[in-house]
């Protein structure tokens, strides 16, 4: 990924986070990160979702923290490089939303 990631400013957060909050992303208490839990019809759909996200994450060299049990996928996004939320997290969360919508 080009350029060093920078932590989002308060102004950038005010501009970028409302759309994600509107679709269920929440800020993690005590950590500069965002989180969302996804539910799918079954394990195959959950795994397909994770596969599509993984391919994009690898392409972007920006990887989620995630946990999967059967049809549930929990995702936390934060940028290690800047120890907090960056535009990379916002972009990946937006992509994740597109994938989730396409699989329901």
UniProtKB/Swiss-Prot annotation:
Upregulation: Up-regulated by a low magnesium-containing diet.
Pfam family, one: Pterin_4a
Origin: domain of life: Eukaryota
InterPro entries: PCD_sf (IPR036428), Pterin_deHydtase (IPR001533)
GO molecular function: 4-alpha-hydroxytetrahydrobiopterin dehydratase activity; identical protein binding; phenylalanine 4-monooxygenase activity; transcription coactivator activity
Primary subcellular site in the record, as a coarse category: cytoplasm
UniProt KW keywords: Acetylation, Activator, Cytoplasm, Lyase, Nucleus, Tetrahydrobiopterin biosynthesis, Transcription, Transcription regulation
SUPFAM superfamilies: PCD-like
Subcellular location field: Cytoplasm; Nucleus
UniProt EC number: 4.2.1.96
Annotated tissue distribution: Mainly expressed in the liver, in pancreatic cells, and in the kidney, especially in the distal convoluted tubule, in the cortical thick ascending limb of Henle's loop and in the connecting tubule.
Family as reported in the entry's similarity comment: Belongs to the pterin-4-alpha-carbinolamine dehydratase family.
Name this protein carries in UniProt: Pterin-4-alpha-carbinolamine dehydratase
């Amino acid at each position: 990924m080009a350029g060093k990631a920078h932590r989002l400013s308060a102004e950038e957060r005010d501009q970028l986070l409302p759309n994600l909050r509107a679709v269920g992303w929440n800020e993690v208490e005590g950590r500069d990160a965002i989180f969302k839990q996804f539910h799918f019809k079954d394990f195959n759909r959950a795994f397909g979702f994770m596969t599509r996200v993984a391919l994009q994450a690898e392409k972007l060299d920006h990887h989620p923290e995630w946990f999967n049990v059967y049809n549930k996928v929990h995702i936390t996004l934060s940028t290690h490089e800047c120890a907090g939320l960056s535009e990379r997290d916002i972009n990946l969360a937006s992509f994740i939303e597109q994938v989730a919508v396409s699989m329901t």
